[in-house]
Amino acid sequence: MELTQNPSVLELVRKTAELTTPKEIVWIDGSEAQLKSLRKIAVETGELIKLNEEKLPGCYLNRSDVNDVARVEGRTFICSRTREEAGPTNNWMDPDEMKAKLHEILRGAMAGRTMYVIPYAMGVIGSPFAKYGIEVTDSILSLIHIS
């Protein structure tokens, strides 16, 4: 199911899938039914633990993976056209150089996994201040936390 006919978004999803080779692509529609299904999968895989429904209805426990929570300064870069835009205390890299590095890292990265596509808005939809984006991930927890 695709939630958009926007050619730029569809091309981004196509290129990302071509690069990362997922077994399937799921578009997140934001529905309660889909969120419930994702929670069920996360409980089955052990990524979420359902808590006592009587004491804590609708609550789950998620333990962060120690290897997946901290930003590593040495591997965090500001990618802008000029080094000056990154500021004096940040690591900088040319965007084209970073894209080339990331393409190598991401090649086949979702093989055997599901690629989730999440459209989102930062701010009030329709506002002149709203910013719109697309997140592509294979992490069910990312989906649950963004919902």
Q: How should each PLM-predicted stretch be described?
A:
Residues 1-140:
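An N-terminal JmjN-like helical accessory module and its immediate linker preceding a catalytic domain
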Residues 144-146:
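Conserved small/polar residues in nucleotide/adenosyl-binding loops
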